[in-house]
């Protein structure tokens, strides 16, 4: 597995950009523009359907895949791997949690829920949610979920040796649906609900870890000709999943409400990231643009930082009479390049590169000397 796998970098980049697009294709409350006509919702929801093929689940699988590839090159013990992942993920997570706890108050006051947000920030229950669930901002849930998933990486290596175990993703997604159908009505209104739901999510998302490891196993064992022969059937299945996603989005366009009770949409949404990973694996032998590898290192920072500028856009445009299409274009054209600029600047600053995964945590000097610890 020596060398750079540009197809993986391309997926990382697509996943990072798609998260920006995903969040701009909803209104400031995270809803599908319910106050406008279906005709005005059409373009935003079409864009969202395409972008939502690369969910955060794709990021999770890429992270597992990269970890397993790194371990195949440089084996380490379990404790060393966990410490390394804690430094890489949880230290930036702590920084951005504190940042967004304060920064989020700006949007909260602008949209009239400042008192409620302030009450959350000054309560221990609020900080428990911030640190354990990542609910300080709508995108921060990804990091604690990923860290919890990576704790199971020794199990995933079984699928690297026996790729058929990748099908466990289907089993675990079925378990997720069944468990949530019990947990939500049983704990509705309880402060424990989000914690139990997150536990169910982490445990059942191990299926994505098995899927990622299976992809690595297939890549290692197959020839280019074999992977090319798989492309047609996998693409056909992917097209079917996309059709189910599109049909569910028709309902969203018509009603102005998200669809949560369509089983076909559930399976299409959660299996599409697996399909994308498999399709790109089958095309891994192609000559992918090398610039993707250079730019993909900023994907993590793009994911972490884009709400900074999206909040500014939403505040500036909150009283606008623009159509949803104009709004999302303006928000994206502002948010994406400004976030990229910020991440690039942080990456070039030794004291800030660690916050976006582009450098180590800066050494700390104790006492009068220059000894680094």
Regions found by a protein language model. Give the residues of each.
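Alpha-helical transmembrane segments and their immediate juxtamembrane cytosolic regions
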Residues: 1-373
